[in-house]
Curated annotation (Swiss-Prot):
Record-given protein name: Protein FAM133B
Keyword tags: Phosphoprotein
Originating organism: Rattus norvegicus
Bilayer-crossing regions: none
Modified residues (Phosphoserine): 82, 190-191, 193, 195
Composition-biased stretches (Basic residues): 89-102, 128-140, 220-237
Family the entry assigns: Belongs to the FAM133 family.
Taxonomic placement: Eukaryota, Metazoa, Chordata, Craniata, Vertebrata
InterPro entries: Fam133
Length: 245
């Protein structure tokens, strides 16, 4: 049995393309583009001049548009100017009205100022007359005022004494309260100490009772052992007496 031949023939693509020959192109080639017909310099100049001149129809259209635009601008300007004039007139009217109102207010304020000044002068005169009357009454009542001053001083002294007494009484009360608080604070401590001593006594009693119980249990155990031993002795004696005859 021989091996199968898996080899494949190698085909050179470049050689295959050469053997096929030149490809038929459907469109224009590069050479056709390079060999295209070109205009002369004179023809180019003529075209540029035509572009600069432009068409007559376009020029007429542009002129009409410019005229219409100019008319619209003029109308808009007229409207704005008329609006500005009307606003300026309104402002002038307002200013005039303000001036008139200011004149009326100034006249009214001047009248009010004059009336207020007259009222102020009258009030000052009244105050001066009152002061004079007070001075005269003070001169006449000077001895009475001295007596009243002495009475007021004595009253003030008695009030001060009362205040000092009240303060001392309050201090005493506060001290007594503080002492009572201390006593109440110390009392629970003493009760605690008493409770501790009571606890010690209770524990000692418990220990004693426990010891007594242990003693009683020991005694009972000894008695039981003694009874058992005596019973055994009696049994032995009975058995020995029965065996002897």
């Amino acid at each position: 049995m021989g091996k199968r031949d898996n080899r494949v023939a190698y085909m050179n693509p470049i050689a295959m393309a050469r053997s096929r020959g030149p490809i038929q192109s459907s469109g224009p080639t590069i050479q056709d583009y390079l060999n295209r017909p070109r205009p002369t310099w004179e023809e180019v100049k003529e075209q540029l001049e035509k572009k600069k001149k432009g068409s007559k129809a376009l020029a007429e259209f542009e002129e009409k548009m410019n005229e219409n635009w100019k008319k619209e601008l003029e109308k808009h300007r007229e409207k704005l100017l008329s609006g500005n004039e009307s606003s300026s007139k309104k402002r002038q009217k307002k200013k005039k009205e303000k001036k008139k109102s200011g004149r009326y207010s100034s006249s009214s304020s001047s009248s009010s100022d004059s009336s207020s000044s007259s009222s102020d002068s009258e009030e000052e005169d009244k105050k001066q007359t009152k002061r004079r009357k007070k001075k005269k009454s003070h001169c006449h009542k000077s001895p009475e005022t001295s007596v009243s001053d002495s009475d007021s001083d004595s009253k003030d002294g008695s009030k001060k004494k009362k205040k000092s007494k009240d303060i001392t009484e309050r201090e005493k009360d506060t001290k007594g309260l503080s002492k009572k608080r201390k006593m109440y604070e110390d009392k629970p401590l003493s009760s605690e100490s008493l409770s501790e001593s009571d606890c010690g006594e209770v524990q000692a009693k418990k220990k004693k009772s426990g010891e007594e119980r242990e003693r009683t249990t020991d005694k009972a155990k000894k008695r039981r052992k003694h009874k058992k031993h005596s019973k055994k002795k009696k049994k032995k004696a009975a058995s020995s007496s029965s065996d002897s005859p």
